[in-house]
């Protein structure tokens, strides 16, 4: 088995917990599902029972061979031996994504599924602290994700639910796609704005007078309690001051 910590995995083995997760997914028999990490096929098997088709992507050769043998007679399951970060999700097909992602790749994978897929709903099992970071609009990741998806916790999963037992608790979260808050034509400007904003490099974005106007328009009294909506307002002021709107 691949022992590389970059791809280390902690497996859900409790039938009770797996069933609790399935209940939260709200999948229909017409749904197409892409699963990140087949593992030993426990969740894959349950996904296939309640959806139309499951495509499960697994990098680890040992786990891929193990799950291939276990699921070889299941006509609803297609297994792919590939790194999820290299996988190309379909552009036109309707689908949902489910996965328990390695802690060490959480940021890369969540960016992948949000910005490089068209999934309507994304269900991920992640480390609890990472989930909190996705909600933090004082961080780059939070400000980028919120433009495309809303994020909510569905289920708390204590470390005891996994084998081997990790040092941290996990949560099942749902990312629901919404109409983008930042049109494609402004995306590069937004990522630049965010990189400067989170590092408080305000002088790189505004003159002193512009900054004062942007804060006033967004009704910001305290930068430490600024909301996502206020950041969007400030970004729109940035576009206006730079003749982009």
Curated annotation (Swiss-Prot):
Keywords: Antibiotic resistance, Methyltransferase, Plasmid, RNA-binding, S-adenosyl-L-methionine, Transferase. The keyword Transferase applies. SUPFAM superfamilies: S-adenosyl-L-methionine-dependent methyltransferases. It catalyses: adenosine(2085) in 23S rRNA + 2 S-adenosyl-L-methionine = N(6)-dimethyladenosine(2085) in 23S rRNA + 2 S-adenosyl-L-homocysteine + 2 H(+). Coiled coil: none annotated. It comes from the Bacteria. S-adenosyl-L-methionine binds at residues 10, 12, 37, 58, 83, 100. Transmembrane segments: none annotated. GO terms for biological process: response to antibiotic. It holds the Pfam family RrnaAD. One of its GO terms (molecular function) is rRNA (adenine-N6,N6-)-dimethyltransferase activity. GO terms for cellular component: cytosol. Its EC number is 2.1.1.184. Belongs to the class I-like SAM-binding methyltransferase superfamily. rRNA adenine N(6)-methyltransferase family. PANTHER family: DIMETHYLADENOSINE TRANSFERASE (PTHR11727), DIMETHYLADENOSINE TRANSFERASE-RELATED (PTHR11727:SF7). This protein produces a dimethylation of the adenine residue at position 2085 in 23S rRNA, resulting in reduced affinity between ribosomes and macrolide-lincosamide-streptogramin B antibiotics. NCBIfam families: Erm23S_rRNA_broad, erm_B_23S_MT. This is rRNA adenine N-6-methyltransferase.
